[in-house]
Amino acid sequence: MQEFSVSHLVFGSGAFSIVIVGLLAATSFVSWGVIVRKILLQRKTARANARFLAQFRKISHFAELQNLCRDEKVACPLRAISKGMLVEASKLSGRVSYDNLHHRAELIEESAQRCVETQRVVDAKYNGFLSVAANLSPFLGLLGTVWGIMDSLWSIGKHGSAELVVVAPGIGAALVTTIAGLLVAIPASGAFNLFSMRTNRNEVFYTNFGSHALAMFKRDELAAVESVQAKGTAE
């Protein structure tokens, strides 16, 4: 009795099935590389954010962010947002009044929003590939399935028999490509949804941080205006 291994089913079913399985194997390899890389990067980023946030909670003035932004050994989204706000603040004039206080705060807020959007793009990097892999892999597997069934039907016509030994190679190859497609799609789909959820969660986290930093800026600006007015009244 002839035995059929998985490798025999794949390599004995023709060049087309080999190409399909090869594409799925390459997609799986790249997908897992992306998944592992993003997991490690997210853990590293989370630790950097936690350290920066702990230091941020110790300060009470917006200008003190300068000291927190000096250490750039590890990439930190919160530091990037803070630097963007500080750069925008440095462009403002030194004249603060009740009339321009709102407009000054708006400029800082817009800068924070741009930084958050930039970080969202960074967080979502390679998510598109995982989405494509999750959506196309089952169809590649289905294509291999259809091809395997067609090969079995061709073998039946060629040999004039529907015995198992005749149809088994084609049917086996069809099942192998189907399984391969699912093995690629399931992890890619799960990872895509997980990373997308984390990207959305991080965006909210970064936006909230920007709001806290903006509130600190507003308090300092308001204190400066009140100080100037108090001096004018005293004089």
PLM features per residue range, with description:
Residues 160-174:
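Hydrophobic alpha-helical transmembrane segments and adjacent short intramembrane/lumenal linkers
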Residues 11, 21, 125-128, 132-135, ...:
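Internal alpha-helical transmembrane segments of multi-pass membrane proteins, especially GPCRs
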Residues 19-36, 133, 137-143, 180, ...:
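Lipid-exposed faces of alpha-helical membrane segments in multi-pass integral membrane proteins
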Residues 14, 32, 65, 82, ...:
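Residue-level signature of catalytic and energy-coupling elements of molecular machines
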Residues 25-28, 40-41, 171, 203-206, ...:
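Structured catalytic/translocation cores of nucleotide/phosphate-coupled proteins
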Residues 47-140, 147-163, 190-235:
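Predominantly long cytosolic amphipathic alpha-helical stalk/bundle segments
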Residues 1-54:
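Hydrophobic membrane-targeting segments
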Residues 173-190:
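Hydrophobic alpha-helical transmembrane segments of polytopic membrane proteins
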